[in-house]
Regions:
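A conserved ligand/cofactor-binding region detector
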Residues: 1-562
């Protein structure tokens, strides 16, 4: 009974908070449990069909997404050696042919490292195998970097009493890909630079994709039927066909129907939020949407500061907003991510401050969508007018929300980051709104310590007033709290650089660019609709069908089943 209870605990809470040792241990057990079960099942199925495990690399390809499933590699070696009587070199060679690694983020916390002592205690046999892999890998590195011991130590799988899962993937996987062109370049030139210099043929870019079957045909049936009306062929089977609607951006009848679809989707969301949260929103307002995982690099905080900026602007000049704006947030924070939760509290305080102020009636409104999930996204994304893709340039690997929004006719305001760059290349710079510094510019600021947010604070009165609102003024009446830690982090830093996500650095550019977005919607609605049509027409490239085709052409080499 005790063994059964212990075993069941592994699968009771998926991915628990890992800000304490018990959470880390449970998470490692879960990773191993899932990896081992998958490898055992794969071996069993292969033997049932082919009988001979020597042919495994001819029939099996395993794509590791992030480092979470990386334990599958040493686990497969364990099965082959300990249960199937393969030698070390045979098992090692098979794993190197079978596994491929997709990196999805450059954030440090995603580059998983396990405490070596904990790992040895929980998974002793897997630890032995990883030690042998590390020794073999470091021997190979020493051929190329014979006089650079520090570099080899950084690239090693084991170092500083840690087991580095990203380095394990780099050591064993046949191909390594980023999920956008920029992301792949960053992997090659920064994150895995040492490996890339030795094995450049291993590295490539395959941009992420989304399925039009869910995010158009299911989530936005009005737009799906409109596109089908004007396109010859099945757009769900051939993503290239979306280009056929491009000429209709100049067709008044088509644009009128397109605009009506958007309005109906906004009415649908307004009904949803009224039913679920009791909030009334104006479907005639501009729906400005920031919905994604809550993380500092995704810069929900920048949007918060911008709303405070507009709030203060309206207080001084009520005529500055003629068409109302509904600012919509939807996000969840990781259980142990304190700063992310603090930003959610800030959003709620801003929501209360804005929505309870009679001066904001008919001007701006703030909505935080509760319990955000795919089902809610299917209602929210088709309703959006503005898509906020404002991550710190160089930190978003790709993003897929940006693709879902542009496909559904929202115009993007964003940085040159991740797949935003490729969206801009396809729709044209005139059909997207880009602001802020580049990935290279941000990298240089960090490397050469040239950034001082205090200068922006002192020289930009509007931004200074916004920052001060975090610790004084109207905001403090709502939520009964100061946001001193956020203020401190923006201007002075905490045990490191100030404003590490360059929020104040990009704030002036964001204010200027957003004004252009607003004026286009208010003063030139016909042009807005044309740009939205272009975005939908160019969304075909971002189909997951194209992504899968490229994985197959460049990595898997699978034959289609007819």
């Amino acid at each position: 009974m005790a063994d059964q209870t212990f075993a069941e605990a592994i699968s009771k809470v998926l991915y628990p908070s890992d800000d304490h040792m018990q959470g880390k241990m449970l998470r490692l057990k879960q990773f191993y449990f899932l990896a081992s079960a998958t490898m055992q099942s794969m071996i069993k199925r292969h033997k049932a069909v082919f009988d001979d495990l020597n042919s495994l690399p001819e029939h099996v390809v395993i794509q590791i997404n992030e480092t979470h499933p990386a334990l599958a590699m040493p686990e497969l070696m364990r099965i082959l050696m300990d249960e199937e009587d393969f030698g070390w070199d045979e098992a090692y060679g098979m794993v190197k042919k079978i596994f491929h690694y997709t990196n999805h983020t450059i954030m440090t916390e995603a580059m998983e490292c396990w405490d070596e002592n904990m790992f040895r205690l929980l998974l002793p046999r897997i630890y032995q195998i990883i030690c042998a892999i590390n020794e073999k890998y470091c021997q190979k590195l020493s051929v190329y970097y014979s006089k650079e011991e520090e570099k080899i130590a950084q690239m090693a799988v084991i170092g500083n009493n840690e087991i580095r899962m990203a380095n394990l993937c780099v050591a064993l996987c046949r191909r390594i890909n980023g999920v956008s062109n920029l992301h792949a370049d960053i992997l090659k030139t920064r994150i895995f630079k040492g490996s890339y210099q030795i094995f450049p043929q291993k590295y490539l870019a395959i941009t992420n994709g989304i399925t039009h079957r869910r995010w158009l045909a299911l989530a936005n049936q009005g737009l799906y039927h409109l596109v089908r009306e004007y396109v010859k062929g099945d757009i769900l089977k051939d993503y290239h066909l979306f280009e056929q609607i491009l000429p209709y951006k100049d067709d008044k009848e088509f644009c009128k129907k397109y605009e009506k679809v958007k309005r109906n989707n906004k009415i649908r969301f307004a009904k949803y939020i009224k039913e679920k949260q009791g909030i009334e929103v104006n479907p005639e307002s501009i729906f400005d949407v920031h919905c994604k995982r809550l993380h500092e690099y995704k810069r929900q905080l920048l949007k918060c500061l911008h709303i405070i900026y507009i709030y203060q602007k309206i207080k001084k000049d009520p005529t500055c907003i003629t068409t109302p704006i509904t600012f919509i947030f939807a996000a969840k924070a990781a259980p142990g991510y304190a700063r992310a939760k603090e930003i959610i509290r800030l959003i709620h305080s801003i929501q209360e401050m804005v929505n309870k102020d009679p001066d904001m009636d008919g001007k701006i409104q703030v909505v935080f969508v509760e319990n955000y999930c795919v089902s809610v996204a299917e209602i929210l994304i088709p309703a959006a007018d503005i898509s906020e893709q404002i991550s710190t340039a160089g930190m978003e690997a790709s993003g897929t929300g940006n693709m879902k929004f542009m496909m559904n006719g929202a115009l993007t305001i964003g940085t040159m980051d991740g797949a935003n760059i490729e969206i801009a290349e396809r729709v044209g710079q005139e059909n997207i709104f880009i602001f802020g510094d580049s990935a290279e510019g941000n990298y240089n600021k960090k490397m050469y310590h040239t950034y001082n947010p205090g200068i922006i604070f002192e020289n930009h009165p509007g931004i200074r007033d916004v920052c001060n609102c975090l610790i004084e003024g109207n905001l403090l009446r709502y939520g009964n709290r100061k946001y001193s830690e956020i203020y401190q982090n923006l201007l002075f830093g905490e045990y490191g650089e100030a404003d590490p996500y360059y929020i104040l650095a990009d704030f002036p550019s964001y204010i200027e660019t957003y004004e252009k977005v607003y004026r286009l919607y208010v003063d030139h609605k016909d042009e807005w609709i044309k740009k939205a049509v272009v975005n939908t027409a160019k969304s075909g490239y971002f189909s997951s069908d194209r992504t899968i085709e490229q994985y197959n052409e460049k990595i898997w080499n699978l034959k289609p089943v007819k």
